[in-house]
Amino acid sequence: MSQYSGKIIFYEGKCFTGRKLEVFGDCDNFQDKGFMNRVNSIRVETGAWICYDHPDFKGQQYILERGEYPDFHRWNGHNDHMGSCKPVRMHGERYRLELFEGCNFTGQCMEFCEDCPFLQGRGWNKNCVNACKVYGDGAWVLYEEPNYRGRMYIVERGDYRSFNDWQSQSANIQSVRRVVNYF
């Protein structure tokens, strides 16, 4: 198994019932695999995954790590829509994230190597993040609310000059955490 693969199983019914779809890598459209976009439970056997409520890796993002999710509330879903998924691109276990107040890496900057449940509690002056840089090996999840709540966005190694680069509608970020439960 390569460092970017894993196994995730989607079920149409709650508690792992009904038709299922097993995925081992990028899947840009569940319907192309003969599976409807209704997902009510998920089992992640290996890897960490980014799931989207629309095909082509669009829409609301959900970060799922190894474990069982017997209904969509367990992955913070608002409904049973799921259209695409891909494994998190991780390279190892060194984590480093820089957050920037302004677009294009301007304004206040703060570095993180550990999870942070409330950015303002660490000295971040605002509740917005307009840009970030991900260094090292690991991936991070950015949350719109404190304590790892609200909409979530995955950022992998690279530069994100604007919140649009991580597919957000706004710069509102209040907590961050590392994706650590990979295998």
Swiss-Prot record:
Monomer. Belongs to the beta/gamma-crystallin family. Coiled coil: none annotated. This is Gamma-crystallin N. It comes from Xenopus tropicalis. Has a two-domain beta-structure, folded into four very similar Greek key motifs. It holds the Pfam family Crystall. It comes from the Eukaryota. Keywords: Eye lens protein, Repeat. Residues 6-46, 47-89, 95-136, 138-180 form the Beta/gamma crystallin 'Greek key' domain. The keyword Repeat applies. GO terms for molecular function: structural constituent of eye lens. SMART domains: XTALbg (SM00247). The keyword Repeat applies. InterPro entries: Beta/Gamma-Crystallin (IPR050252), Beta/gamma_crystallin (IPR001064), G_crystallin-like (IPR011024). Crystallins are the dominant structural components of the vertebrate eye lens.
